[in-house]
Amino acid sequence: DETLIKLDGTKQKKRLGANAILSVSLASCKVAALSNKISLFKYIGNKKTLPLPLMNIINGGKHANNSLRIQEFMIRPDKAKNFNEALNICFLVIQKLKSLLIGKDLSTNVGDEGGFAPSISSNELAIELILEAIDKAGFKAGTDISLCLDVAANELYKEKKYSVNSSKFISSEKTIEYYLNLCKKYPIKSIEDPFFENDWDAWINLTQHLNNNIQIVGDDLFVTNKERLLKGIKSKAANTILVKPNQIGTLTETLEVINLAHLNGYKTIISHRSGDSEDTFIADLAVATNSSQ
């Protein structure tokens, strides 16, 4: 990885390209694991804790052809005893959600991330549908299963204002109030990218309000970048980082970011990238780094 970084010679990996560099980086790691005749996750980190899946079940925003403002509505099976049970719980909820949508004459077409993309415009209605599906599947929302949101606020930001709940733009302070009310009303345990990537004051403010109870997840905020994560740690913005290896370009730099996060009490969520391949490397990475999700 160090050789690749030096060969490229640019901060943003513009000469060789981050995707090309990452492909060589991950392939080298796989070859090393094979040559040592050990599992990939053991070669990377030798951890044995399986993460909880965050299952994306309703799509909105740029990922769907509907009017939902929030980009991803997810479920997290908190009480699952193992990964197989976690997947089964999510599958049962998805089945019930599909039946509910059909019963309400709503589309079961899927968005870019595989979640349903019904023609609805209310964030609250999307949440209510998920809660009903959880109940019909025989689980208790807030105990067995938590709700997680990816707002993708970069897409809802204009002139220091946000259009998170409707086409009307409101201040960051009013947007914080909206999030706080959502979290009081519903069993939401994680909010990803609630604000624009450079609106640090809003990130800090929301983290102060929700830090003890809710995951405030930085994806666009941190972009798997050590410098941006350090700024977040120092300013106490967010408490969780979404990790995408192809945002930074090498496995070594990805591991450095994960280690920095863990050393400073930040949780890590290992994630694919929109339009990613079916390669399974990130599953091994999640286990190897003891990432909880």
PLM region spans:
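Beta-strand segments within the central parallel beta-sheet cores of soluble alpha/beta enzyme folds
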Residues: 1-2, 39-56, 88, 144-148, ...
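Metal- or metallocofactor-binding catalytic centers and their adjacent structured scaffolds
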Residues: 1-38, 87, 115
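Short, hydrophobic/aliphatic alpha-helical segments
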Residues: 1-13, 46-54, 94-105, 135, ...
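Buried hydrophobic packing segments
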Residues: 24-32, 36, 73, 130, ...
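Mobile "lid/hinge" segments at catalytic clefts and subdomain interfaces of large enzymes
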Residues: 48-111
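Active-site mouth loops of central-metabolism enzymes
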Residues: 54, 76-88, 119, 163-173, ...
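Active-site-proximal beta-alpha loop/turn segments in soluble metabolic enzymes
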Residues: 72-83, 107-123, 152-165
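Catalytic core of soluble alpha/beta enzymes
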Residues: 124-293
